UniProtKB/Swiss-Prot annotation:
<feature type="binding site">
    <location>
        <position position="878"/>
    </location>
    <ligand>
        <name>Mg(2+)</name>
    </ligand>
</feature>
<feature type="transmembrane region" description="Helical">
    <location>
        <begin position="383"/>
        <end position="403"/>
    </location>
</feature>
<feature type="binding site">
    <location>
        <position position="768"/>
    </location>
    <ligand>
        <name>ATP</name>
    </ligand>
</feature>
<dbReference type="InterPro" id="IPR023298">
    <property type="entry name" value="ATPase_P-typ_TM_dom_sf"/>
</dbReference>
<dbReference type="Pfam" id="PF16209">
    <property type="entry name" value="PhoLip_ATPase_N"/>
</dbReference>
<dbReference type="Pfam" id="PF13246">
    <property type="entry name" value="Cation_ATPase"/>
</dbReference>
<keyword id="KW-0333">Golgi apparatus</keyword>
<dbReference type="InterPro" id="IPR023214">
    <property type="entry name" value="HAD_sf"/>
</dbReference>
<keyword id="KW-0472">Membrane</keyword>
<dbReference type="GO" id="GO:0005768">
    <property type="term" value="C:endosome"/>
</dbReference>
<feature type="topological domain" description="Cytoplasmic">
    <location>
        <begin position="1"/>
        <end position="144"/>
    </location>
</feature>
<feature type="transmembrane region" description="Helical">
    <location>
        <begin position="1013"/>
        <end position="1033"/>
    </location>
</feature>
<feature type="topological domain" description="Extracellular">
    <location>
        <begin position="166"/>
        <end position="173"/>
    </location>
</feature>
<comment type="similarity">
    <text>Belongs to the cation transport ATPase (P-type) (TC 3.A.3) family. Type IV subfamily.</text>
</comment>
<feature type="binding site">
    <location>
        <position position="470"/>
    </location>
    <ligand>
        <name>Mg(2+)</name>
    </ligand>
</feature>
<dbReference type="GO" id="GO:0048471">
    <property type="term" value="C:perinuclear region of cytoplasm"/>
</dbReference>
<keyword id="KW-0067">ATP-binding</keyword>
Length: 1147
């Protein structure tokens, strides 16, 4: 039945014919360059078929015609253009369209990236101009700062509306009151915003300047000169010392290491902690001195800049020799920017700079992030504007459209403009600054820095947390924890027993032999008078330790010293074996941990080159082994091997170690390996199985001849080489099982548990291997012990992706582990289905992810779920992900400051994210929600009073309050108490951390929604009506004092409403209340002319004696109580009948 279901369902015969025509076209064109690699738009084999099984949730996603998936960009554009021609049905229209497209392409055209020829040490020979080698995290420059900031502000409806209102005051017929009444608040808002952006931009400028000003040694004809990183050009010869950052993409020409190779750390580029071995160009490495680089005529041909950090194609040519020397260049001859030199000193020629480097091309441009709260408030202001227009139209309608009604309509729009409060932006921006200050001053999260002060509320709305692994969840330090021999297991507390066995073994070797045959000593020792069991265990320990000390790709490097020539030299093995002088370098931290462990038990690696390695025994004897063959680790084989010959005995041994899934079929039958591997995995240990096989000289010579022939094959070289190696991998002797732990950051487990309880789904995106990522996910409790893990098997085409997605769909409540390659294939065909399924998982682990893939995953989550995302990382490879997320958090740690500098928030440890979210994020959101709604209430209530006042005066467009009263109402009279809400909190910080479930409520957005907004609108209408009608009813005899009466009651009502809203009092809140009340009382003495109806024209001024009477005071108090008391009663009843989640904790 399976082969009856087509892989690509075709809906019509026409579609099928079109598909065959495309296939014929591609066949005719030919493979073209890069045909050996599967491209993004490459056609799949349409003869494949799917198994019979139900499709997933979205049927359309699986039944689309294959033309939707397999059309090349060029073919797609051609098809679109033909459709456009047919649609317009006119040559002149098509000509106009083409001209417009050409103009758009000219205006938006980017510089085309091209391959280049780079002459060594001759930047002036470059044919084209290349970008500056500078790091830029700034959003603006000197010319775009003011326009950019103004655009970012006036794109908000609130600010644009007030700009229009303020400009309308220049029209005499529309003028209401004084100009400063409108322009002063708007100017203040813009000044605060520009100042804040200027400070943030200046800080980014300083950080960029610090990175761009790092000094490097540049090799010239006259010698070495110091040059800034930003001044490096294509063609320069740059010298990079050990532990120094590589400033630009270079081709590796020369090193101080005599082997002609060095190690670099790439964790800031790809997230992998494995050190990468780089090989210098042999032609330049053989030159006697550095200055000889200028005595030859040589150039590098490099491919055009591209995103892929794992590939490079180029050639090195020396044309002053006869015949010219040509060397092919690959990824192992390159030094990418943002990597760190781990050994020796390197010299390279710069081929890419600035935005053409791999690291920058994999980093997205910084964008202006707008918080969800700001977007929600922007929607509410649009609703308020609609209410403003409706109210103005109603007033004009009730006026009977008398006279120039359109002028009255605009005047009403201006009179009620306080429905949309301009002080909203001021209060929110000042609140954000206060939240940032509180975060940086929190002693429980020292070193935390707020770099983007506009989105602190985002910390309280997060649903997805995407985290890096290396250096973020882990300390990036491997520690040897367990050695298992099958019958006996050794842990950290019994390592001294292993050390004793090794010491006794080699001491007896040294005493029983005269250096003639040291390797046979353990066998003779095992035949001594000691018990048989003890001898067996001791012999097995000896063999296991020796295998671990030999089977690796670790190189010991000794501390550098300066030679006579001025070049860096390194201590050789026969010169200096001091332990404090030695460091280990390898492509895997696991291997370094194993070699360090063998050193701790007595067998030390002291020297290694391409042909041999030397071990030092506890007795001080040096054992030399010739390296005959080396089989490096690959993700496909999951194992590595080495064939060595003992120089003392001429014994040839094949050692191998690898993952249990790969080694279980290679080693001899045993009954303990699978069980013990499972036990160690449950402890969070990374396991490796070690085995050996002894070879005779004849066996090795036969293997070597077959292996050499396979390596010379032109076709299927990889498969043939693997087949020859597999002929040795049979019935190998199982020596031991090792367990290594990648130590987690402090308090990672409780922090992840807290985040899960808070309703945050955690995704781990790492460039590391699948096995490593899975192990860390278990040990960190990202995946709980009771949850199953679904490892998404590798897929390469649409059919395989379909099958695997259907298999994954049947799983329930299991974590997903998927590799970057499989992820890209699935996203190419079934993007929506994969994201939908992944979002249902309790945890997701994506391994082997490139920086661009990390950013793409974040973008997909934002687009498909519409939920708030947060990305956290500590390396340069995490910058794109951090910038793509709604909220980016950088950890300043061992991998440098690049992620920290590009993030919105910077912390020093992963565990700090718990308090940052549970306490500061939660408080920031709830405070801003309350502050925003209270400010809108403040504008609505005064607009309601204006509407009542106008209706009393026969719907005349006459202002109730003018001049300083309107400015003071939103500033000195009520601003301090309202702004003091930024100090309010519903529960104590300790409770918020202890009960992270409180955070989960925030993701629903109930603190600020249309429901709560409508409640505040009703409160405003009620209070505004009570204040105005109460003033008119109670003071009918003294109608001339309505302004003073109503305004006084209004101020008291606002102060009481703030007091009723506050849940936790702070001494500054009390000060704010009394300070505002004092300012109002004091202003009555010198602002009496503002409190009369119509002021001078009516001859009405405030009677100071009147406001001091008991009648005035009790009637104002009565109005205020009537406006506030019912609301307090309703609030009290609601808390009793339907208490919020935090009320029990706060009580």
């Amino acid at each position: 039945m399976a082969d009856q279901i087509p892989l690509y369902p075709v809906r019509s015969a026409a579609a099928a014919a079109a598909s065959h025509r495309r296939a014929a076209y591609y066949s005719a064109v030919g493979p073209g360059p890069g045909a050996d690699r599967r491209g993004r738009y490459q056609l799949e084999d349409e003869s494949a078929h799917l198994d019979e099984m139900p499709l997933m949730m979205s049927e359309e996603g699986f039944e689309n015609d294959e033309s939707d998936y397999h059309t090349l960009p060029r073919a797609r554009i051609t098809r679109r253009e033909r459709g456009l021609e047919w649609f317009v049905c006119g040559g002149w229209k098509f000509l106009c369209t083409s001209c417009c497209d050409w103009l758009i392409n000219v205006c938006q055209r980017k510089k085309e990236l091209k391959a280049r020829t780079v002459w060594l040490g001759c930047p002036e020979k470059c044919e084209e101009k290349h970008p500056r080698n500078s790091i830029k995290n700034q959003k603006y420059n000197v010319f775009t700062f003011i326009p950019g900031v103004l655009y970012e502000q006036f794109k908000f409806f609130l600010n644009l509306y007030f700009l229009v209102v303020s400009c309308s005051q220049f029209v005499p017929a529309l003028k209401i009151g004084y100009l400063y009444t409108y322009w002063a608040p708007l100017g203040f808002v813009m000044a605060v915003t520009i100042a804040r952006e200027a400070i943030d931009e200046f800080r980014r400028f300083q950080r960029d300047k610090e990175m761009n000003s790092q000094l490097y040694s540049k090799l010239t004809v006259r010698g070495k000169v110091q040059v800034k990183s930003s001044d490096i050009q294509v063609g320069d010869l740059i010298i990079v010392e050990k532990n120094q950052r590589i400033p630009s993409d270079m081709v590796f020409l020369r090193t101080s290491e005599k082997a002609g190779s060095c190690f670099i750390r790439t964790d800031q580029l790809d997230g992998e902690t494995d050190w990468k071995l780089k090989v210098a160009v042999s032609c330049t490495q053989r030159l006697p001195a550095l200055g000889d680089l200028f005595s030859i005529s040589a150039y590098v041909y490099a491919q055009k800049p591209q995103l892929d950090i794992h590939s490079f194609e180029g050639t090195f040519t020396r044309d002053d020799s006869d015949p010219p020397i040509h060397e092919s260049l690959s990824i192992e001859n390159t030094l990418w920017a943002s990597t760190i030199v781990a050994s020796g000193t390197v010299i390279g020629v710069v081929i890419y700079t600035g935005k053409e480097t791999r690291s920058v091309m994999n980093t997205s441009n910084p964008k202006n992030k707008v918080g969800l709260l700001d977007l929600e408030l922007n929607q509410l202001t649009k609703a308020l504007f609609l209410a403003l227009v409706v109210l103005s139209v109603v007033m004009v309608t009730l006026q009977g459209f008398a006279g120039p009604w359109y002028r009255n309509l605009f005047r009403f729009l201006l009179l009620f403009s306080y429905i949309i409060p301009i002080s909203l932006r001021v209060n929110l921006d000042m609140g954000k600054a206060a939240y940032g200050w509180m975060i940086m001053k929190d002693e429980n999260i020292p070193g935390t820095v707020v770099r983007t002060s506009t989105i602190p509320e985002e910390l309280g709305r997060l649903v997805y947390l995407l985290t890096d692994k290396t250096g973020t969840l882990t300390q990036n330090e491997m520690v040897f924890k367990r050695l298992h021999l099958g019958t006996v297991s050794y842990g950290t507390d019994t390592m001294d027993e292993i050390q004793s066995h090794v010491l006794n073994s080699y001491l007896q070797v040294h005493s029983q032999t005269s250096g003639h045959n040291p390797s046979s000593a353990p066998l003779r020792r095992s035949q001594s008078s000691t018990p048989k069991v003890k001898k067996s265990v001791s012999s097995r320990i000896h063999e296991a330790v020796k295998a671990i000390a030999l089977c690796h790709n670790v190189t010991p490097v000794y501390e550098a010293r300066t030679g006579i020539t001025g070049e860096t030299e390194f201590a050789e093995a026969d010169q200096d074996f001091s332990d404090e002088n030695r460091t280990y370098q390898a492509s895997s931290p696991d291997e370094v941990a194993l070699v360090r462990w063998t050193e701790s038990v007595g067998l030390t690696l002291v020297s290694r080159d391409l042909a041999s390695m030397q071990l030092k025994t506890p007795s001080g004897q040096v054992l030399t082994y010739c390296i005959l063959q080396m089989f490096p680790f690959t993700s496909e084989s999951k194992r590595m091997g080495i064939i060595v010959r003992d120089e003392a005995t001429a014994e040839i041994t094949f050692y191998m170690k690898g993952a249990d899934v790969a080694m279980s079929t290679i080693v001899q039958y045993n009954d303990w390996l699978e069980e013990e591997c499972g036990n160690m995995a449950r402890e969070g240990l990374r396991t490796l199985v070690v085995a050996k096989r002894t070879l005779t000289e004849e066996q090795y010579q036969d293997f070597e001849s077959r292996y050499s022939q396979a390596k010379l094959s032109i076709h299927d070289r990889t498969l043939k080489v693997a087949a020859v190696v597999e002929s040795l991998e049979r019935e190998m002797e199982l020596l031991c099982l090792t367990g290594v732990e990648d130590q987690l950051q402090a308090d990672v487990r409780p922090t992840l548990e807290m985040l899960r309880n808070a309703g945050i789904k955690i995704w781990m995106l790492t460039g590391d291997k699948l096995e490593t990522a899975t192990c860390i996910a278990k040990s960190s409790h990202l995946v709980s012990r009771t949850q199953d893990i679904h490892i998404f098997r590798p897929v390469t085409n649409r059919g395989e992706a379909h099958l695997e997605l259907n298999a994954f769909r049947r799983k329930h409540d299991c974590a997903l582990v998927i590799s970057g390659d499989s992820l890209e294939v699935c996203l190419r065909y079934y993007e929506h289905e994969l994201v939908e399924l992944a979002c249902q998982c309790p945890a997701v682990v994506c391994c082997r992810c490139s920086p661009t893939q990390k950013a793409h995953i974040v973008t997909l989550l934002r687009q498909h779920t519409r939920k708030r995302t947060c990305a956290i990382g500590d390396g340069g490879n995490d910058v794109s992900m951090i910038q793509a997320a709604d909220c980016g958090i950088g950890i300043e740690g061992k991998e440098g400051k690049q992620a920290s500098l590009a993030a919105d928030f910077s912390i020093t440890q992963f565990r700090h994210i718990g308090r940052l979210l549970m306490v500061h994020g939660r408080n920031s959101y709830k405070r801003s929600a309350a502050l925003g709604q209270f400010v809108m209430h403040r504008g609505l209530i005064i607009s309601t009073m204006q509407a009542v006042f106008s209706s009393v005066f026969y719907f005349a467009s006459v202002p109730l309050y003018q001049g300083f009263l309107m400015v003071g109402y939103a500033t000195i009279y009520t601003m301090f108490p309202v702004f003091s809400l930024v100090l309010d909190q519903d529960v104590k910080p300790e409770m918020a951390i202890l009960y992270p479930e409180l955070y989960k409520d925030l993701t629903k957005g109930r603190s600020l929604s249309f429901k709560t907004f409508l409640i505040w609108v009703l409160i405003s209408i009620y209070q505004g009506g009570i204040l105005m009608y109460g003033a008119l009813l109670l003071f009918e005899a003294e109608f001339v004092h309505v302004v003073a009466i109503s305004f006084t009651a209004l101020i008291l009502t606002e102060l009481l409403m703030v007091a009723l809203t506050i849940r936790t009092w702070h001494w500054l809140m009390v000060v704010a209340e009394f300070l505002s009340l004092g300012c109002y009382v004091a202003s009555l003495a010198f602002l009496n002319e503002y409190f009369g109806i119509g002021r001078v024209s009516f001859g009405a001024f405030l009677d100071v004696a009147f406001i001091t009477t008991v009648t005035f005071l009790w009637k104002v108090s009565a109005i205020t109580v009537v406006s506030c008391l019912p609301l307090y009663v309703l609030k009290y009843l609601k808390r009793k009948l339907s208490p919020p989640s935090y009320s029990k904790l706060s009580s």
